[in-house]
Design a protein with these regions (language model features):
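Transmembrane alpha-helices of multi-pass small-molecule transport proteins
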Residues: 1-35, 62-63, 118-123, 139-157, ...
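Hydrophobic transmembrane alpha-helices of multi-pass small-molecule transport proteins
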Residues: 2, 66, 75-97, 142, ...
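Specific transmembrane alpha-helical segments of multi-pass solute transporters/efflux pumps
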Residues: 9-51, 55-56, 92, 174-192
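Juxtamembrane helix-entry segments on the extracytoplasmic side of multipass membrane proteins
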Residues: 17-23, 95-117, 154-172, 219-229
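Cytoplasmic-side transmembrane-helix entry/capping segments in multi-pass membrane proteins
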Residues: 20-28, 75-87, 132-142
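Hydrophobic residues within alpha-helical transmembrane segments
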Residues: 27, 31, 58, 80-84, ...
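Hydrophobic/aromatic residues within transmembrane alpha-helices
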Residues: 43, 69-75, 130, 137, ...
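Helix-helix packing/entry segments at the starts of transmembrane helices
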Residues: 50-58, 127-146, 175-214
């Protein structure tokens, strides 16, 4: 993010930015780039991956509820139903249609993942209110996330260098998954409604399935078609507005 900011502006921040702008964006970075992942990775470490993945995808639903509070967006009951069906489609895809695969590990893991999901939902909603230019905003939120992660590391763990085998995936993850993707997500948040943004998130498991099946030759289940169709229909309903 620092390199992108430098190439676009030479690390020159908008002179009109005030102290409260910086603090607000650093706070958002703590929510969406640090606390979210800390709670989420704790869940994956301690709990069942299917359980965690399902609870993780509650954040778009939480985002819609928060949008009605902070952004005063009207809760369209039909869109809410469509989003709920989209979530059910995700549930079918993740469990391959077998609900018995869900094993709840314990209340601590569930609350941790739900809290992490809430952090990212709140981050997404409050990001719509930011007046900072998108590249500067991206730099500030990752800087805020770095500060919070460093403090958490100092208080609760110790620093360890990744192995050579782990280094490349970490770099790719940092640049694309937790880097460039944020710019597109923030751009979408400022362009369309909260509900439309939320339903688009449900496309990600469908896209992931395509890559996994194509590149890793994973087994294909009929439930993928059923769940994916539900997600697609729900999404098309929510995105029927012209600006979507």
């Amino acid at each position: 993010m620092g390199l992108i900011l430098y190439l676009s502006r030479g690390l020159k921040f908008d002179a009109s930015l005030k102290k409260n702008h910086y603090l607000y964006n650093l706070f958002l970075g703590s929510l969406g780039c640090a606390l979210y992942y800390l709670f989420l990775y704790y869940g994956y470490y301690e709990g069942n991956s299917i359980e965690v993945l399902i609870l993780q995808y509650s954040w778009p639903l939480q985002m819609i509820l928060l949008g009605s509070i902070f952004m005063k967006e009207k809760l369209d009951p039909f869109k809410i139903i469509a989003v709920f069906f989209g979530f059910m489609g995700i549930l079918i895809i993740i469990t391959t249609g077998d609900i018995n695969q869900i094993r709840f590990t314990g209340i601590n893991v569930s609350l941790s993942v739900l809290l992490g999901a809430f952090c990212f939902a709140l981050f997404s909603i409050l990001s719509k209110k930011s007046e900072v230019e998108i590249f500067q905003f991206s730099f500030l939120i990752f800087f805020g996330g770095t500060i919070t992660s460093t403090l958490a590391l100092g208080f609760f763990s110790t620093f360890q260098l990744p192995s050579k085998k782990e280094l490349l995936p970490i770099i790719i993850n940092g640049i694309f998954i937790n880097g460039v993707s944020y710019i597109f997500w923030l751009k979408a948040l400022k362009s369309i409604s909260v509900t439309n943004s939320a339903i688009l998130v449900f496309f990600t498991p469908v896209l992931s399935l395509i890559w996994i099946i194509l590149f890793f030759k994973e087994q294909f289940f009929i439930s993928y078609i059923f769940g994916g169709s539900i997600v697609l229909i729900s999404s098309l309903y929510c995105l029927k507005e012209k600006n979507s």
